[in-house]
């Protein structure tokens, strides 16, 4: 296999992979992957499925997913769209196929900013980790960003992403610690 790993996976998985991708460059990475080798895409099956839809390239997908993005459901999205009929829905490719099919745009977090900036709609429903809403509001303040609800609440926050702080980054650079051995 030619193993392509999503950037959000562990350092150990990255070390065993041939190539690392982001949601923003995954399509290009797959397009340039060796044609004579089968691809194993890890660890997010929804992102991998979206990449296959975009590229037409068959891949074997690891059966993993982001616990935040799979909480968005067809039902929760239909409900919020009913409440905001003029709003556009932007979702991250880690969302399930059912949510992606209901979306006006499926794109990486970086591309969400450009899409929001250029959208004719003033109201945008965002189906990704809630931390992105702060950035969108800061970069495109003239738009109204509505958090997409999960089945149970609108609290789609990733505690893993919140573990990284500026202080921890500073300390890591100052002390070269913690060190990870593989």
Language-model regions, residue ranges each:
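The feature marks the mature, well-folded catalytic cores of soluble enzymes
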Residues: 1-182
């Amino acid at each position: 296999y030619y193993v392509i790993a999503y950037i959000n996976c562990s350092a150990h998985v990255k070390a065993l992979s041939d190539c690392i991708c982001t949601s923003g460059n995954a399509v290009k990475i797959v397009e340039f992957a060796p044609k004579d080798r089968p691809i194993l895409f890890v660890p997010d099956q929804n992102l991998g499925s979206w990449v296959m839809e975009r590229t037409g390239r068959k891949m074997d997908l690891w059966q993993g997913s982001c616990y935040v993005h799979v909480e968005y459901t067809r039902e929760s999205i239909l409900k919020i769209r009913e409440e905001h009929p003029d709003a556009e829905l932007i979702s991250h490719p880690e969302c399930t196929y059912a949510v992606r099919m209901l979306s006006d745009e499926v794109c990486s977090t970086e591309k969400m900013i450009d899409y929001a900036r250029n959208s004719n709609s003033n109201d945008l429903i965002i189906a990704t980790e809630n931390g992105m809403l702060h950035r969108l509001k800061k970069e495109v303040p003239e738009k109204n960003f509505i958090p997409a609800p999960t089945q149970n609440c609108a609290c789609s926050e990733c505690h893993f992403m919140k573990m990284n702080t500026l202080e921890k980054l500073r300390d890591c650079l100052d002390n070269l610690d913690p060190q990870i051995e593989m």
